[in-house]
Every structure is written in C-alpha cells, then in structure tokens.
C-alpha cells in the first residue's frame, strides 16, 4: 500500500508541474483557447492510449507503474475542471462559438490522440 501511495503521489507531482509549465509557456499565445490546457489534455490522451495497451500487454509490470503513470502522472497532467471552466467562461460571456470550439477541440482531440496512442503501442508490439 505504501509503494502505491508513493507512486501516485510522485506521478501526480510530475504531471501537475508539467501542466503548469505548459500553461506558462502556451496560454499567452491565444487567450481564447488556452493552449496549455489543450496541450495537457491532448498529451494525456495520447499517453493514456499507449499506457492502456502497454499495461494490458505487459501484465508482469509491477502495479505501481500503472498507478504512477495513469492515476498519478496523467491525473496530475490532464484537467477536466480547468477545461470545464474555460468552456463555461466563454458561455457565460455569450461567446457560444468559442465555447463550442474549445469543447470540440478537447473532446475530439483527446479521443483522436487516445486512439493514435493505442494504435502506436499496438504497432510497437507487433514489430517486436
């Protein structure tokens, strides 16, 4: 139990710091669509796709690795709450086009990159 908690704690810290760096580096470029939040969610979508295949195919990996990557790192990196407030801020301000665009970018982008991550990992295993 202790190692599981440590794995989640450390992974979440790395993920949250990466999300913060992405926000610092990217959000200023296009305020209508905070690119740091979008990048965090898209990266998270790709990584979860890869991780889903890897952790299913490599059943011998210690469970702490799954907790570190999926629960910790990706839990700290990706952000549904920030995405939600960004969409709702546009909606409350009457910017419904932007609200729909931001929502669509996050949802379609994340699903697409999750599928791409799964495809990539399957291709790696097929080639090995």
Curated annotation (Swiss-Prot):
Topology versus the membrane, per the UniProt entry?
A: Multi-pass membrane protein
**Keyword Transmembrane: yes or no?**
yes
The protein's matches in InterPro entries, at most eight in alphabetical order, are given as: FluC
Question: One Pfam family this chain carries?
Answer: CRCB
The entry summarizes how activity is regulated as: Na(+) is not transported, but it plays an essential structural role and its presence is essential for fluoride channel function.
**Chemical reaction(s) catalysed:** fluoride(in) = fluoride(out)
Where, in this chain's numbering, is Na(+) bound? 75, 78
Q: Which cysteines are joined by disulfide bonds?
A: none
Instruction: Keywords in alphabetical order, please.
Output: Cell inner membrane, Cell membrane, Ion channel, Ion transport, Membrane, Metal-binding, Sodium, Transmembrane, Transmembrane helix, Transport
Q: Where are the transmembrane segments?
A: 5-25, 35-55, 67-87, 96-116
Protein name, UniProt field: Fluoride-specific ion channel FluC
A GO CC annotation recorded here is: plasma membrane
> What Gene Ontology terms for biological process does this UniProt record contain?
cellular detoxification of fluoride
Report the function annotation for this chain.
Fluoride-specific ion channel. Important for reducing fluoride concentration in the cell, thus reducing its toxicity.
Q: Which GO terms describe its molecular function?
A: fluoride channel activity; metal ion binding
Q: Which family does it belong to?
A: Belongs to the fluoride channel Fluc/FEX (TC 1.A.43) family.
Location(s), subcellular: Cell inner membrane
């Amino acid at each position: 139990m202790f190692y599981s908690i440590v794995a989640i704690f450390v992974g979440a810290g790395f993920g949250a710091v990466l999300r913060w760096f992405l926000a610092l580096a990217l959000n200023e470029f296009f305020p209508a669509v905070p690119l740091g939040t979008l990048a965090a969610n898209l990266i998270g979508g790709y990584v979860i796709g890869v991780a889903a295949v890897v952790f299913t195919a490599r059943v011998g990996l210690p469970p702490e690795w799954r907790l570190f990557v999926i629960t910790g790192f990706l839990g700290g990196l990706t952000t549904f709450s920030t995405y939600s407030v960004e969409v709702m801020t546009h909606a409350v301000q009457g910017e419904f086009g932007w609200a729909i665009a931001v929502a669509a970018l996050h949802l379609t982008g994340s699903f697409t990159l999750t599928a791409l991550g799964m495809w990539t990992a399957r291709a790696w295993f097929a080639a090995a």
